[in-house]
Amino acid sequence: MQITQGEVTLRDTRASDIEDEIRWMNTDTDWFYADTPWETLEPVDPEELRREMEGIMAGLKEDSVRWRLEIEASGRHIGLVSSYFPEGSVVRALGIEICEKEFRGRGIGAAALTAFMEYYRRFGEDRFLLETWSGNERMLGCARKLGFAEVKRTEGAYTVDGKKADAILLEKVYGETEGR
């Protein structure tokens, strides 16, 4: 499966992506700490991750609804989009990681999330959530640009560098007047 939005392509995982994933999980981890700086990313066993990703690829059927797609820009694998249903929710939450630094701040995240939402809209979904924290200015700016609105704030949910930070839940609801 492949979806293109401007210079961004969302696509299924390929074997050539595995080494990037290993690097992002073990050495080039700054993307993780921008997203969840209060957590610690434990290094992964490369062989274990390789087997896990190969299993995911092997089990993927053409008609399966995707929960994860890789992001490619300028012909390069740079990150991923994913989705999940938060506990007790029937509304899909979206996630995005631009793991390659030089591709951040260029609108690629907004294009990737737009393409991902359009993919799910084909299945009748018109509401989406994003979960982030008050210090993630890049994600908050992207969310606002895409029309997400804050629906819940939990003050002091996280401690980052000794300071309290808020958990923020944002939602986008496509309206009757927006194109499908």
Predicted regions located by residue number:
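Terminal substrate-recognition subdomain of acyl/acetyltransferases
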Residues: 1, 161-180
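A short, well-structured alpha-helix characteristic of acyl/acetyltransferase catalytic modules
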Residues: 1-50, 176-180
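Acetyl-CoA-dependent GNAT
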Residues: 42-103, 173-177
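Conserved beta-strand-loop-alpha-helix junction that forms the acyl-donor binding cleft
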Residues: 99, 130-140
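Conserved acetyl-CoA-binding loop-helix of GNAT-fold acetyltransferases
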Residues: 105-119, 137, 141-145
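Conserved catalytic-core motifs of GNAT/GCN5-like acyltransferases
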Residues: 129-132, 149-166
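Conserved active-site tyrosine of GNAT-family acetyltransferases
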Residues: 143, 148, 170
